UniProtKB/Swiss-Prot annotation:
InterPro entries: Nucleotide-bd_a/b_plait_sf, Ribosomal_uL23-like, Ribosomal_uL23/eL15/eS24_sf, Ribosomal_uL23_CS, Ribosomal_uL23_N. It comes from the Eukaryota. Signal peptide: none annotated. This is Large ribosomal subunit protein uL23B. Its main location: cytoplasm. It comes from Schizosaccharomyces pombe (strain 972 / ATCC 24843) (Fission yeast). It is found in: Cytoplasm. One of its GO terms (molecular function) is rRNA binding. Belongs to the universal ribosomal protein uL23 family. This protein binds to a specific region on the 26S rRNA. Component of the ribosome, a large ribonucleoprotein complex responsible for the synthesis of proteins in the cell. The small ribosomal subunit (SSU) binds messenger RNAs (mRNAs) and translates the encoded message by selecting cognate aminoacyl-transfer RNA (tRNA) molecules. The large subunit (LSU) contains the ribosomal catalytic site termed the peptidyl transferase center (PTC), which catalyzes the formation of peptide bonds, thereby polymerizing the amino acids delivered by tRNAs into a polypeptide chain. Component of the large ribosomal subunit (LSU). Mature yeast ribosomes consist of a small (40S) and a large (60S) subunit. The 40S small subunit contains 1 molecule of ribosomal RNA (18S rRNA) and at least 33 different proteins. The large 60S subunit contains 3 rRNA molecules (25S, 5.8S and 5S rRNA) and at least 46 different proteins. uL23 is associated with the polypeptide exit tunnel.
Length: 141
C-alpha cells in the first residue's frame, strides 16, 4: 500500500501542481464590467425608406452676396468677397460652397453674426483668383 502512495506522490511531483490559480489583486473599489463581444447590427428592414436629403446644400449655404460700399472696398483692396450665409453654416461648408458654385479657391474665411441675427462671411480668395472678376461673373457689380 505504501508503495502505491509513493508512486502517486511521485507522479504528482513530476506533473506539478496546476490546480491553484493565483488571484488577481484588485486595486480599485469600483467594479468595471469587462468588454464583451458586440456584433454588428443586421436589421431585417430599413427604418427609413429614403434617407433625408442634405439640409444644407451649396445653394442654401450662400444666401446672397453683399454689395455695400464697404464690401466693394474689400473686393478691390483685399481680394475678398462678402456674402450673407446660412446661420448654421460653418467655415468649412462655406469654403466648399464657394468652390463648387463659383469655382474659386478660398484661402481664408471670417464669419460674424450680425445684430439682426444673420451671418456674414468674408471669403478671401487665393492670389490667382481675382475677386473683381468673380463678382462680375456672379453678377453683383
Amino acid at each position: 500500500m505504501s508503495v502505491g502512495k509513493a508512486k502517486g506522490a511521485q507522479k504528482t511531483v513530476q506533473k506539478g501542481i496546476h490546480n491553484k490559480v493565483a488571484r488577481k489583486v484588485r486595486t480599485s473599489t469600483t467594479f468595471r464590467r469587462p468588454k464583451t463581444l458586440e456584433l454588428a447590427r443586421k436589421p431585417k428592414y430599413a427604418r427609413k425608406s429614403v434617407p433625408h436629403a442634405s439640409r444644407l446644400d451649396e445653394y442654401k449655404i450662400i444666401v446672397n452676396p453683399i454689395n455695400s460700399e464697404s464690401a466693394m472696398k474689400k473686393i478691390e483692396d483685399d481680394n475678398t468677397l462678402v456674402f450673407h450665409v446660412h446661420l448654421k453654416a460653418n467655415k468649412f461648408t462655406i469654403k466648399n460652397a464657394v468652390k463648387k458654385l463659383y469655382s474659386v479657391d478660398a484661402v481664408k474665411i471670417n464669419t460674424l453674426i450680425r445684430p439682426n441675427g444673420t451671418k456674414k462671411a468674408f471669403v478671401k480668395l487665393s492670389a490667382d483668383a481675382d475677386a473683381l472678376d468673380v463678382a462680375n461673373r456672379i453678377g453683383f457689380l
